[in-house]
Amino acid sequence: MRMEGENWVYEVRGIPDEFFQRSEGIPMTKREIRIISLSDLRIRPGMRVMDIGCGSGSMTVEISNIIGENGSVTGLDVSGEAADLTMRNCRNLCRFSNYRIVISDVYKYDSDEEFDAVFVGGGTARIHDLFERIERMVHHASRVVVNAIQIHTAYLSLEEMNTRGYSGVNITQVMVSNGMRTSEGYAMIARNPVFIISGDAP
């Protein structure tokens, strides 16, 4: 549990969920999923990263703190409320002013900027169209990581990566249970399983 006034000053990844401001109806990539997704994203200082469907901004914040002052992260969300929440969390938790938050539908987003890595935490309703957009954002060997809750989304993401010639394609299913204090001890409360799909763009 976060103590009032406590800041996250550690170098390890995975800021506890309670450090982030939340808003009802806006999803957040939970701590354990973030840790594995960040590992799969393979980012380093100086990289340019896109966070599609940034939601509460938990991944945007973590990415910002890894890539440092010479890197840049763009958080993209169709919801103005989500973009505002991401901005608030970035202001509170980012160590660098290397983030940019954009309100846009990913399918309409138009930019000439190339990214070294793309994380997809939302906006997965139209997977084929999504990968068409990603193809315009990346260069050879850019890293792409997709989080999915639905099996169908995971399957289609794998199909798109393999069809488009991605290398090192991998899928991991993560199932996490967290302890909840009860009158008699602790009970393990399960969260929804999440699929993490990753690969290198051709």
UniProtKB/Swiss-Prot annotation:
Belongs to the methyltransferase superfamily. Archaeal-type CbiT family. Keywords: Cobalamin biosynthesis, Methyltransferase, S-adenosyl-L-methionine, Transferase. It catalyses: Co-precorrin-6B + S-adenosyl-L-methionine = Co-precorrin-7 + S-adenosyl-L-homocysteine + CO2. Coiled coil: none annotated. One of its GO terms (biological process) is anaerobic cobalamin biosynthetic process. It comes from Thermoplasma acidophilum (strain ATCC 25905 / DSM 1728 / JCM 9062 / NBRC 15155 / AMRC-C165). This is Probable cobalt-precorrin-6B C(15)-methyltransferase (decarboxylating). One of its GO terms (molecular function) is cobalt-precorrin-6B C5-methyltransferase activity. The keyword Ribonucleoprotein does not apply. InterPro entries: CbiT (IPR023475), Cbl_synth_MTase_CbiT (IPR014008), Cobalamin_biosynth_MTase (IPR050714), Methyltranfer_dom (IPR025714), SAM-dependent_MTases_sf (IPR029063). S-adenosyl-L-methionine binds at residues 29, 53-57, 77, 106. Its EC number is 2.1.1.196. It holds the Pfam family Methyltransf_31. Pathway: Cofactor biosynthesis; adenosylcobalamin biosynthesis; cob(II)yrinate a,c-diamide from sirohydrochlorin (anaerobic route): step 8/10. It is an enzyme of class 2 (transferase).
